[in-house]
Amino acid sequence: MLSRIKTFLKKEPVLGVAAICALVTVFFVLPDKEYLHYIDWRVLCLLFCLMAVVAGFQAVGFFRWLTELLLKVIRSGRALSVTLVMLPFFSAMAVTNDVALLIFVPFTLSLLDELDQRKAQIPMVVLQTVAANLGSMATPVGNPQNLFLYSAYDLGAGEFFAVTLPLTAVSLVALCAAALPVLPKALPKQEREAGASLAKGRLVIYALLFGLCLLTVLRIVPFVITTVVIVAAFLLLDRKLLGKVDYMLLLTFVCFFVVSENLGRIEAVRSFLQSLLEKNTLLTAVGASQVISNVPAAVLLSPFTDRWQDLLAGVNIGGLGTPIASLASLISLKLYMARPGARVGKFLLVFTAANLVGLALLLAFSMLI
């Protein structure tokens, strides 16, 4: 039994840690009917649907085709580096940070494999993760905490953008500078086939399913309908692709939902955070995000402060730091870990270093303005 647990923890360390943390919090908050409301089924279903569609894109050769197209347009390694980081940065503003990462991280890993630039995979995926988290703070729909605070404080567009756009602008400049050295100036010439094969019929279907996911992200189509349609479509087209979905990632999210919600119900934790808010709302929001993630931090702290500007900035800046500061970061980690020969220790080291630098930069900027 113990050997099985050790094997599982080696294979799924993130889920293992999340499950242990969830179990610990259960001793402080005994299971009751409130547990039924912990799980954000919309988020889980969207993640499932997007992972299935991305698997479909990979199966029909779409990423390989897109790689060839991109390399025809962009010849410089530095231009490609900046482009790969800016894609999730700007797309996250419209489709949220987790969706942007689910789209662009698999594509980037495939592209760097094609270019024989595997050493660049860790820094590039880390920068894409930071970019998606920081780009998403620009708009009310970019991430869940923005949407919640925008509604909770009944903010106007001008008020909101006055806080987020300066931070976004600084992030843009810093990310471009950080991206430049990731790939060599001149990309190595690769012998490529004269055009990747593309199953166009199925590609059209997967593209339509992807569009359905985006409509669900924008809350135009209910997530239940999208989930049913996508499951039915894959059962008819290629049911084996449903096995490509990372169900362990979904379970990891469930565990962290339990952790964050239970911490929010512990009176000692709530009282401690309230006392900190009175001293410094910005730093409290950043600190709380490191422990319980930025979305629960926004929900937990908002009733105790009217300093929404600092809270809004804090939970967005606080998405940098630990891997759970923004749960979207777990997506990148899991996608990278699924690669053959993944170096998880190095990934976490680079991830932590990049996040701490970004966190320090944006905190310093926030305190100056």
Where are each of the predicted segments found?
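Core mid-bundle transmembrane helix pairs that form the ion/substrate translocation pathway
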Residues: 160-240, 348-361
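Hydrophobic transmembrane alpha-helices that form the pore/transport pathway of multi-pass ion
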Residues: 86, 90-134, 148, 299-312, ...
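Structural signal for alpha-helical transmembrane segments and their membrane-water exit/capping regions
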Residues: 3-34, 46-61, 180-185, 212-240, ...
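Transmembrane helical segments that form the transport core of multi-pass membrane transport proteins
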Residues: 38, 60, 64-69, 209-306
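Short helix-coil transition sites and intra-membrane helix breaks within transmembrane domains
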Residues: 55-61, 91-103, 135-143, 286-301, ...
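N-terminal membrane topogenic signal
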Residues: 1-18, 76-77, 197-205
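Membrane-interfacial loop-to-helix junctions in multi-pass transporters
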Residues: 41-43, 72-85, 114-125, 200-204, ...
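C-terminal transmembrane helix pair
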Residues: 161-172, 283-369
